[in-house]
UniProtKB/Swiss-Prot annotation:
Enzyme class: transferase
EC number: 2.4.2.1, 2.4.2.2
GO cellular component: cytosol
Top-level taxon of the source organism: Bacteria
Record protein name field: Pyrimidine/purine nucleoside phosphorylase
Gene of this entry: ppnP
Database matches in NCBIfam families: PRK10579.1
Reaction equations catalysed: a purine D-ribonucleoside + phosphate = a purine nucleobase + alpha-D-ribose 1-phosphate; adenosine + phosphate = alpha-D-ribose 1-phosphate + adenine; cytidine + phosphate = cytosine + alpha-D-ribose 1-phosphate; guanosine + phosphate = alpha-D-ribose 1-phosphate + guanine
Amino acid sequence: MLQSNEYFSGKVKSIGFTSSSTGRASVGVMAEGEYTFSTAQPEEMTVVSGALHVLLPGETEWKTYEAGQVFHVPGHSEFHLQVAEPTSYLCRYL
C-alpha cells in the first residue's frame, strides 16, 4: 500500500511503500530550503536527482551528496539538510 506524506508546509513530499527488493522505504522530492529531520530508526538516503547539503549527527562539517550518492543516518537522531534546487531521494528504513 502507498502512503503519501507531506512536511514543512508542502515543501517536502514523499510516498512510502514496502517491496521485497527495497524493504520499507519512501521516495520523495524536496523543494529549495533548509530542513531538520528526526529519525526513529537508521536510514539510508540515496540522492536520485539534484543534491543535498547534509550535516549528520556528531559532525561539524556539511557534506554535499549528489545524484547516485548515498549517506546513512543513525536511528533516534536528527540531521540537517540544505537544498538549493528541487531534489529527489530514496529513503530506506533499515
